[in-house]
């Protein structure tokens, strides 16, 4: 479905994209057209030019699904501890030809330092051009004890600072910043009307994401006024360890 036009790939099919009845599992968007975290993960993975961690080899790869060749790119891998402190940074120059996957030998393994506090750590990836413009990013929550993420439960609650702009009657632009010294994990944005009902469907430029200390992200939201029942909606912000707040 996504890779069928590639010379070296046989195609990829999602099973399944949506549920035919209300369900908590097996869907990228649910019965009511709400996009799940899986939707945003799949969309990230399908970027035309993409940086990723190969879970099997633990190497970092640059995937180019376009027909263009990119020269003098810089791939950066940051290892962070559970508190979001950077403990190691590695970079690698890379050329990416069209319809190719390049493994970065200099970033072959995670090489987790022994001074990581506990088991949980993060990997933050960035692919930039020769002018340092960001082309792709990625983020992974991992553990030295594979699959054991229980240490995340020790993270304290944090507040996320936000500013809201309404450039149009059916759109909002949110700028979110983590001003705390602790990561804000799995931030979820949920558009609602004054009576507390969800607005669906909604187009979020991003959702279900993490913000490290000091990190900022801009999210654009669009909807149809008919789906908001002609009301002025607001955004409910929640997260794994994020204090609930309302953005108007």
Cite the ranges covered by each PLM segment:
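Carbohydrate-binding surfaces of carbohydrate-active enzymes
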Residues: 1-206, 212-221, 230, 234
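Short beta-strand-to-loop capping motifs
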Residues: 223-225
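Eukaryote-biased activation of long, low-complexity terminal tails and linkers
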Residues: 244-246
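Conserved recognition-core residues within compact binding domains
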Residues: 240
């Amino acid at each position: 479905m996504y890779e069928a036009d590639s010379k070296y790939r046989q195609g990829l099919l999602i099973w399944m994209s949506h549920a035919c009845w209300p369900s908590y599992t097996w869907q990228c968007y649910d019965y009511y057209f709400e996009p799940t975290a899986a939707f945003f993960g799949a969309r990230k993975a399908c970027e035309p030019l993409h940086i990723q961690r190969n879970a099997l080899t633990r190497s970092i790869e640059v995937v180019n699904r376009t027909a263009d060749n990119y020269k003098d790119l810089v791939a950066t891998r940051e290892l962070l501890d559970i508190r979001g402190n950077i403990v190691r940074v590695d970079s690698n120059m890379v050329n990416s030809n069209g319809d190719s996957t390049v493994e970065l030998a200099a970033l072959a393994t995670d090489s987790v330092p022994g001074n990581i506090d506990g088991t949980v750590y993060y990997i933050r990836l960035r692919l930039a051009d020769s002018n340092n413009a960001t082309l792709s990013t990625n983020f992974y929550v991992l553990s030295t004890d594979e699959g054991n993420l229980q240490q995340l439960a020790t993270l304290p609650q944090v507040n996320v600072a936000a500013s809201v702009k309404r450039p149009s009657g059916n759109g909002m632009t949110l700028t979110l910043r983590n001003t705390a010294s602790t990561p804000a994990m799995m931030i979820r944005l949920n558009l609602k009307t004054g009576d507390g009902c969800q607005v669906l469907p909604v187009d979020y430029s991003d959702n279900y994401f993490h913000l490290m200390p000091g990190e900022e992200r801009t999210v654009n939201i669009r909807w149809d006024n008919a789906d908001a029942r002609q009301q002025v909606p607001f955004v409910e912000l929640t997260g794994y360890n994020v204090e609930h707040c309302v953005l108007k």
